[in-house]
């Protein structure tokens, strides 16, 4: 348990918390994973399901994690251990704490790819980026990918090194408004392309014929990516939240911000790809191939493609950085609390871990391509381990902590501190005690089954 008594860092107020939490949620998963899933699982019906889940499942988890953090003023390990010495409580805290430590290294590798593409667009090499084989050639080049990866890591670490207010909050206040403006500009340009309206209709208008159970499962899985739940981030950020900051109002603002950016991401990508492909949603492939192969081809066939490419990858870089900052801060907070170290020493340690683990993922498509775990490259394995296994378990642990250990009454007291009432109390109670754990179990089993080929998602 954390026995180190020192002043806890804090956000300056509600705006600082909301922008930092929203920045954590708006990452690479929102920019390329959300549009891909929306295209694959029914467009408008997927969007509708996602919004409903954000207002219930996502809302309840954000509120719970933020309340736990503010109540204890500790990072995940100390927060869980504040309520008892059980080994299960310790395990619940540590799994929340370890997740960001494992995610941020491989996440930074992809961030490095974004830097490379942004540089090439600035140099005017949009045609080169659209060529078949360019992406595979780049990621198999160990030196080039490692250099870009290290640059991304150094930017992230430098911001964390500066502290909560001078680093995280200040950067979020600059990056998030720019990100919004860029997303609006690109979305407007995308939806006005010839043939793009079919993509707009597919994405925004629900069609019950496209509904399937897998649409629900996929939308639930996207919740983890989009809202940064079950990563320890919101517990950490909650511990920096002032008592006079409304948890419920802040959560609502994060929901609005995240949903708006997710919709913008869909409008940036789906209509443009529809116009490029003649209305074939299958062109929206999964994973890196969408952002680093398909999108450059789309931009190469558009007027002002180079300019749009620069704006798009600048937007993606900002989104990647705001999320990597949140992930890294959660890890640093754990080291500060559990090891009694200062911010600078803790930041250096996570920087070393990022470089060490990230290098495995970075070289996994090149010099280390022959080395696999469960048939997966290093990056794919770390992604599977954290997102498909650890995060659902962390969510279940948080739900059990709230409903079985702390008690929903005490959590409610923390939520309504300084408030007249808990407006979505009934939704929260039903979700956190019953439905959220069930949803997390469904995600866990379906993701593992899909990874081993037992089902196809």
Functional labels for PLM-detected ranges:
Residues 5-8, 37-41, 76-95, 108-165, ...:
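Inter-helical loop and helix-membrane interface segments of multi-pass membrane transporters/permeases
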Residues 10-21, 45-49, 87-101, 147-152, ...:
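Select transmembrane alpha-helical segments in multipass membrane proteins
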Residues 379-401, 423-457:
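A generic transmembrane alpha-helix motif of multi-pass inner-membrane proteins
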Residues 37, 41, 67, 88-103, ...:
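Membrane-water interface regions at transmembrane-helix termini and the short interhelical loops
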Residues 13-53, 235-238, 249-252, 256-259, ...:
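Transmembrane helix-boundary motif of multi-pass solute transporters/channels
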Residues 2-7, 11, 169, 173-321, ...:
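Membrane-embedded translocation segments of transport machinery
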Residues 2-4, 78, 111-140, 241-244, ...:
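Helix-loop-helix connectors at the membrane interface of multi-pass transporters/channels
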Residues 1-32, 61-66, 70-83, 87-91, ...:
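Membrane-interface "cap" regions at the ends of multi-pass membrane proteins
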């Amino acid at each position: 348990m954390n026995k180190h008594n020192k002043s806890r860092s804090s956000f300056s107020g509600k705006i600082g918390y909301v922008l930092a939490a929203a920045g954590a949620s708006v990452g690479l998963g929102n920019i390329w994973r959300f549009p891909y899933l929306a295209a694959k699982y029914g467009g408008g019906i997927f969007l509708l399901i996602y919004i409903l889940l954000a207002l219930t499942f996502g809302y309840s988890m954000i509120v719970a994690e933020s309340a736990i953090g503010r109540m204890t003023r500790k990072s995940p390990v100390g927060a869980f251990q504040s309520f008892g010495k059980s080994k299960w409580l310790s395990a619940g805290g540590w799994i929340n704490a370890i997740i960001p430590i494992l995610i941020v290294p491989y996440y930074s590798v992809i961030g490095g790819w974004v830097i490379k593409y942004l540089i090439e667009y600035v140099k005017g090499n949009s045609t080169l980026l659209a060529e078949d084989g360019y992406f595979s050639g780049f990621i198999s080049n160990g030196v080039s990918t490692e250099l870009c990866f290290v640059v991304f890591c150094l930017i992230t670490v430098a911001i964390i090194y500066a502290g909560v207010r001078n680093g995280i909050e200040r950067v979020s206040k600059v990056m998030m408004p720019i990100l919004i403006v860029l997303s609006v500009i690109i979305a407007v340009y995308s939806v006005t392309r010839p043939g793009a309206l079919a993509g707009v209709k597919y994405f925004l208008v629900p069609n019950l014929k496209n509904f399937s159970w897998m649409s629900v499962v996929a939308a639930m899985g996207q919740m983890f990516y989009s809202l940064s739940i079950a990563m320890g981030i919101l517990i950490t950020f909650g511990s920096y939240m002032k008592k006079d900051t409304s948890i419920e109002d802040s959560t609502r603002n994060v929901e609005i911000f995240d949903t708006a950016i997710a919709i913008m991401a869909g409008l940036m990508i789906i209509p443009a790809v529809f116009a490029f492909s003649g209305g074939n949603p299958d062109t929206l492939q999964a994973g890196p191939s969408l952002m680093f192969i398909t999108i450059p081809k789309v931009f190469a066939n558009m007027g002002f493609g180079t300019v749009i490419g620069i704006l798009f990858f600048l937007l993606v870089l900002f989104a990647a950085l705001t999320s990597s900052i949140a992930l890294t801060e959660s890890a640093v907070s754990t080291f500060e609390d559990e090891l009694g170290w200062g911010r600078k020493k803790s930041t250096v340690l996570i920087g070393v871990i990022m470089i060490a683990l990230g290098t495995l993922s970075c070289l996994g498509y090149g010099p280390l391509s022959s080395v696999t775990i469960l048939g997966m490259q290093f990056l794919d394995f770390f992604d599977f381990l954290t997102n498909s296994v650890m995060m659902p378990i962390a969510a279940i642990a948080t739900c059990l902590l709230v409903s079985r250990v702390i008690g929903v009454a005490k959590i409610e007291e923390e939520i309504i501190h300084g408030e007249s009432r808990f407006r979505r109390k009934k939704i929260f109670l039903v979700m956190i005690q019953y439905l959220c754990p069930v949803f997390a179990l469904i995600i866990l089993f379906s993701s593992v089954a899909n990874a081993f080929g037992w089902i196809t998602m």
